[in-house]
């Protein structure tokens, strides 16, 4: 299990209980179904041919500064998992808008958004 927390300053905290955490401030951040901090621990549990993290990472490396929420969802749609282990929720956080967008159960036609207040 892991969590990713982001703020409007572009900082990202990836937490993996029992393993630790990593603080990032990069153009983008990703997590997947296996451990980012210690991938060797979860390697035996990875579904064969699950290279979604690597494919998404490669696509994001080629994006420019005008990268949009819609483009982020195109990438997530292209790497979604289907079947018994289908992707249940895909999140995109926009630092510029201080807003989270998400899609449930691979229904990329219906994007829900949540606006955070700007109180700090």
Predicted regions and their residues:
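C-terminal, well-structured catalytic/ligand-binding subdomain of enzymes
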Residues: 4-120
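Phosphate-interacting basic helix/loop segments used at nucleotide- and nucleic-acid interfaces
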Residues: 1
């Amino acid at each position: 299990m892991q969590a990713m927390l982001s703020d409007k300053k572009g900082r990202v905290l990836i937490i993996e209980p029992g393993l630790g955490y990593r603080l990032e401030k990069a153009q983008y951040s990703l997590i997947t179904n296996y451990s980012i901090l210690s991938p060797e621990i979860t390697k035996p549990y990875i579904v064969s041919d699950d290279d979604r993290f690597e494919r998404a990472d490669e696509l994001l490396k080629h994006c420019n500064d005008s990268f949009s929420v819609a483009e982020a969802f195109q990438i997530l749609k292209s790497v979604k998992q289907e079947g018994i282990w289908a992707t249940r929720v895909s999140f995109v956080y926009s630092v510029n808008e201080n807003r989270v967008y998400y899609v449930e159960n691979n229904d990329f036609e219906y994007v829900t958004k949540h606006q955070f207040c700007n109180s700090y």
